Amino acid sequence: MNRRLALQALGCLMLQSAPARADDTPALDALRSGGVLLLRHALTEPGIGDPPGFRLDDCSTQRNLSAAGRAQARAAGEALRARDVTVGAVCSSAWCRCIDTAKEMFPELQVAVLPALNSFFAGQGDRERQTSALRQWITALDGGRRVALVTHQVNVLALTGDNLAMGEAVVVQPDRRGGVRTAGRLAL
């Protein structure tokens, strides 16, 4: 009887620890047909926002990727390549944690800074202007060009309404009204 209970308990634990994986086929299909991969930067050192007095031109003054975040970004890039998904360009916020996420995920590409991706957390930047500029940038893309954009939680939320954890991604596409819609989430 004890052995049976132990096996049942072990089975329950195994079921609980099995990762749930959503069907990301719609997102992958959208990305392959020219969708935009919109990512929140990978895991960082503990904290919220950046330290007082941080500077964009000095990574040592910012909250940066942790070792786990660098590994997470590399694994995400490898997961995309394993699914035969490539991107032709990668753009990033000017924050080091976003640039480093992009470099770790896509080491073969040059990372271009796109100011519309810069954080507007805690009153920095201009939420409405940047979100509008990003929406226009995405809708102006050539439909067959696959692009990855690395940014911050507030930017993704403002553009799509999706609240992503660090390292999560959505695929977005222009809609028929001049806006942007989420085609799906990707488990990277």
Give a label for each model feature.
Residues 125-133:
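Short, surface-exposed amphipathic charged segments that create phosphate/polyanion-binding patches used
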Residues 35-37, 145-151:
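Generic beta-sheet signal
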Residues 5-21:
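N-terminal export signals
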Residues 24-113, 120-124, 162-188:
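Active-site-proximal alpha-helix that buttresses catalytic centers in soluble enzyme cores
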